[in-house]
């Protein structure tokens, strides 16, 4: 059985803060996000390198991020990584709200030594993940690199975004992964920025997203 609960927030009106809890037979997760934060993070997924990547989202996206997860790591990391992506996506969707005044689109290129990645995001309301990454190793620390796709798929499906991720160069898997998450964070930061010239306006000619 799966349950996701929106935890009541004490934030004042206008704050882009949300907290979501997700409990299943495989994981117990609580996520809290502040989209207008300073990059503070408290992370506990049980997978060290995954926490390191989540920290990149907070630091480079200037998003305050609090994630607690107890997962069935005695099996493997799949449920933990995927379900954190799902819950984080739900929290983002709630925190973003009606999307009035946001820039909607964001992109970033991020290098790390020989590695270079590009991420483009659209808060379109239409979930879609388009990811072209060929990791040069099957695992980084305790993180199975196949699960990076599962994390982003979970996020995309529940945040309602279109996301393009391309690793353009790189032969060190750690560097590949880190550039992906840093570029993702900076693309989010750009897309979620408020444009004072379109305050109160939904960024679509349809009038809704």
From Swiss-Prot:
Domain of life: Bacteria
Name used for this protein in its record: Imidazoleglycerol-phosphate dehydratase
Assigned EC number: 4.2.1.19
Organism: Paracidovorax citrulli (strain AAC00-1) (Acidovorax citrulli)
Residues of the signal peptide: none
PROSITE patterns given in the database record: IGP_DEHYDRATASE_1 (PS00954), IGP_DEHYDRATASE_2 (PS00955)
EC top class, as a word: lyase
Family statement: Belongs to the imidazoleglycerol-phosphate dehydratase family.
Protein's cellular compartments: Cytoplasm
GO molecular function: imidazoleglycerol-phosphate dehydratase activity
Gene from which the chain derives: hisB
Database matches in InterPro entries: IGPD_sf, ImidazoleglycerolP_deHydtase, ImidazoleglycerP_deHydtase_CS, Ribosomal_Su5_D2-typ_SF
Gene3D superfamilies, alphabetized: Imidazole glycerol phosphate dehydratase, domain 1
GO biological process, one term: L-histidine biosynthetic process
Biological pathway: Amino-acid biosynthesis; L-histidine biosynthesis; L-histidine from 5-phospho-alpha-D-ribose 1-diphosphate: step 6/9
Keywords from the UniProt entry: Amino-acid biosynthesis, Cytoplasm, Histidine biosynthesis, Lyase
GO CC, one annotated term: cytoplasm
One Pfam family here: IGPD
């Amino acid at each position: 059985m799966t349950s996701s609960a929106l935890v009541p927030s004490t934030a004042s009106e206008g704050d882009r803060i949300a907290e979501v809890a997700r409990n299943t037979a495989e994981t117990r997760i609580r996520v809290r996000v502040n989209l207008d934060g300073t990059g503070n993070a408290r992370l506990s997924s049980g997978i060290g390198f995954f926490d390191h990547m989540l920290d990149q989202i907070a630091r480079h996206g200037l998003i305050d991020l609090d994630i607690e997860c107890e997962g069935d790591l005695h099996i493997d990391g799949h449920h933990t990584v995927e379900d954190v992506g799902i819950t984080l996506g739900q929290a983002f969707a709630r925190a973003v709200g009606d999307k009035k005044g946001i820039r909607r689109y964001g992109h970033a290129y991020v290098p790390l030594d020989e590695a270079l990645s590009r991420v483009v995001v659209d808060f379109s309301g239409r979930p879609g993940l388009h990811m072209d990454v060929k990791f040069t190793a099957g695992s980084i620390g305790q993180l199975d690199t196949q699960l990076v796709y599962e994390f982003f798929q979970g996020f995309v499906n529940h945040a309602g975004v279109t996301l393009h991720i391309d690793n353009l160069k790189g032969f060190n898997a750690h560097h590949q992964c880190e550039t992906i998450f840093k570029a993702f964070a900076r693309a989010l930061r750009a897309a979620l920025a408020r444009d004072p010239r379109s305050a109160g306006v939904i960024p679509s000619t349809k009038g809704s997203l």
